[in-house]
Amino acid sequence: MDITKQNEADKLTLFLDGKLDTLTAPQLDAALKEAFEECDNVEVNLEKLAYVSSAGLRVLIAVHKRVNGKGRLEISHVTGTVLDVFEATGFSVLLNII
C-alpha cells in the first residue's frame, strides 16, 4: 500500500492506495501517529483503497479512540467494497466518515 500526504492550513490528509491488510496495517498506524504529531485534524482518503481487512479496521478504530477529544480523525471517499465492509461491521457509524 502507498501512503501519500498533503498538508493544508488546518488539516493533514493521508491518501491510501492499494490494500489495507495485516501486512500494511502497521504502516498506516505509523503514518497516523506521525500525522497527529504534526496536526490535530487528520483526514484519511480511501478513494484508491481496494481492500480493507480486520487488521486495517483495528488500526482506524484504535487511532479514533486514541485521539478522540484531542484531535479529529476523518475518513473520506469510502466507496465500493471498502464501504460495504465499513457498513457490515458498523464502522460507518463509529468513525467520522465525511
Whereabouts are the PLM-identified features?
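STAS-typified acidic loop motif
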Residues: 4-28, 47
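Short acidic-hydrophobic, aromatic-tinged amphipathic segments that line or gate anion-handling sites
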Residues: 96-98
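Amphipathic alpha-helical interaction surfaces in cytosolic regulatory modules
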Residues: 22-94
